[in-house]
A protein has these predicted regions:
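Leucine-rich repeat
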Residues: 1-4, 9-50, 55-73, 78-177, ...
């Protein structure tokens, strides 16, 4: 019912496994802290956010056939944890990476994802806005080398980065500047050939089954 989007005292809203849900009403739930829409297999559009929702901390959109996220998604200014596992999103605006409180982003198995396709004029903003994401997973997302070309440097506050089973051929030199990064996992990246830099405070680096890794990169890792 459309009134659900205006229940101002609602703190938790879970509609998981509502397989016949096709439309979700616009939201202006100022008290909402947790929204779960995972496994709503017929929901192709994320609802419009009509105003700032400062209290929403966690959003689960796993296993949804979403095509994109609306511009109003940025009204979720308090969002801390975003789960997009196996989500159908084909376009992910890079401005979301810079949402002020977002700290955990899990996007495993978003295989059709075109990473950070910038909106017109957005790239200039990206060079200034920093990300607070410290735990980022994009395993099995079909990521290629262009993943590192646009907004990757925004993520320099990360502590954990998981990029297993992707298609890029190198790790960029700029990753040397990621001084907070402790755990990095690129296992199963069969095309990875070159590691151009290693974060200075890394304590756990996994590159299992990276069968194309050059001998010089392998030696560099062994000497760390």
């Amino acid at each position: 019912h459309h009134s659900i989007g205006f229940l101002n005292k609602l703190r938790i809203l879970s509609a998981r496994y509502c397989s016949k849900l096709t439309i979700f009403p616009p939201l202006n739930l100022t008290s909402l802290e947790r929204l779960e829409l995972s496994n709503c297999l017929s929901l192709e559009n994320f609802p419009e956010i009509l105003g700032e929702m400062k209290n929403l901390l966690m959003l689960a959109l796993d296993n949804l056939p979403l095509k994109e996220l609306p511009v109003s998604f940025q009204n979720l200014v308090g969002l801390q944890s975003l789960y997009l596992d196996n989500c159908g999103i084909g376009w992910f605006p890079s401005s979301i990476i810079g949402m002020p409180k977002l700290s955990l982003l899990n996007a495993t198995s978003c295989k059709g994802w075109q990473w950070v396709k910038s909106e017109e004029g957005e790239e200039k903003v990206d060079s200034i806005v920093r990300s607070n994401v410290y735990d980022f997973s994009a395993n099995r997302c079909n990521l290629y080398d262009d993943f590192f070309s646009t907004s990757f440097s925004q993520l320099d506050h990360m502590e954990t980065l998981c990029l297993r089973n992707n298609n890029f051929t190198f790790l960029p030199e700029c990753i040397k500047e990621f001084q907070f990064l402790r755990r990095l996992d690129v296992s199963g990246c069969l095309h990875l050939q070159e590691i151009r830099g290693v974060p200075p405070n890394l304590v756990d680096f996994r590159a299992i089954e990276c069968i194309s890794l050059s001998s010089s990169s392998s030696s560099m890792l062994l000497n760390q």
